[in-house]
Amino acid sequence: MDKKKIAIIVTFMLIVILGLGITYAWLIQTINGDKIHSIRVGNFRFSLTEENSLTLESGEFMSDDKGMNQDGFKFSVENIGVGYGSYSIYLDDDTIPTGTTRLNDKFIKYSLEINGNKYSPLELKDRKIYNGILNKSGKDNITLRVWLNKDVNGDIGGQAFKTKIRIEANQEVSNQQATTITYDYNYLVNDVFDEYYNTNIFNPCCETAISLTKYETYYDDVGRVFFVTANKNKANRGWYFPSNNVLAANKTYTYSFEAKANVDLTAIIGSEQEGTAGQIGNIKYSLTSEYKRYTRTFKADSNKYSAFIFYDWTDTNDRTIEIRNLQIQEGGLSVAEIVKMKGTNLYTFPYLKRDNYQLLGWYTDPVNGDKIDENTIVPSTDTTYYAHWKYIGEK
């Protein structure tokens, strides 16, 4: 394989459709240094930042992980009008030098990062690479990354890939055409549960009110499971994980877990720092024989009670509760949001990497649901999709 440097030369071309007229604006990317070059066309503003070149260094074929870690070509699209606007991004062929062979698209892979969220890499099969929609004052900060697809064999010596980014924008879109898609990662990216709670100790509470007959921790195909069988004869009793550290008072935290029980029951589950004097605000969850996901966001209180508790069902017969993927992090849920045009394809999804887990795809429910793909049509109402994972670490 020829190891010559192959450059992606970028020309930036903007087209904005304004009512019945069409305005063309061309911006040739030639700037260097720390400047930001902006152009306004109609009610849209387009900007190129200082990091504005794409280069395939030494003709190297890259894995997706390596390609996704390039600096990329950065630009932004901003709606400075008074209503919604849509736009599409194209990678068009640009003129290559006479006598040079154009590199076949099959060798090219690309990915977009939009407002800090990386989206899954795609092969360059269609020169329209993105459809976006912006509310008034909305802005998308975009990074385009392009690399040579290591999964495609062939000689690329002496070939060139030269493209121009074309953006078509339409200012005639109503807000009834916009749908907000939330991609829920279905795990907490900055999970610190084991930092704050000792999961090696299953503590019964209190006196002889509860009897733990079996408790263990193991991993199934989805994640870590805490399995407890117990009986008890008093309300406001149960078992808990003692705290290693205290949550910072007045800070916001989110916990999430999946749970099921051998019979239908209601249990209080959560941090004692949500509330005062050992109470957690009567946060009750109805558990059934099937796993269901539960999430809660709260502001931590400062009090002497700081365990994570599983309380308040009352039955002298043995009851089994299984808690899976129990996590906590500062802030809210780990999600990505994007506004899409109703009736178009979803097209691409957030790019997620999680240690010891394999991403199975995106579904309509956090535990079960139907699987969706890039051809799924954007629904007419705001919708959340959930990542599903398979645990592949040591069990």
PLM regions with names:
Residues M62-K66, Y130-K139, K284-K292, A300-D301:
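Short proline/glycine- and polar residue-rich coil/turn motifs
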Residues N69-S86, Y90-D92, Y130-Q177:
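C-terminal, structured domain-capping segment
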Residues D2-D65, G157-F161, N170-T180, G393-K395:
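Short, polar/proline-rich extracytoplasmic segments that appear immediately after membrane translocation
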Residues G42-E51, S88-Y90, D94-R127, C206-E207, ...:
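A surface/secretory-pathway sequence property marking extracellular, secreted
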Residues N175-Y187, L333-K395:
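Secondary-structure capping and domain/repeat boundary segments
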Residues W26, S38-N43, Q70, V77, ...:
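Extracellular and organelle-lumenal recognition/adhesion modules and their flexible linkers in secreted
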Residues L18, I22, I28-Q29, D65-N117:
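Surface-exposed interaction patch
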Residues L14-V16, W147-I156, K299-N303:
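Short, surface-exposed loop/turn segments at beta-strand-coil junctions that are enriched for proline
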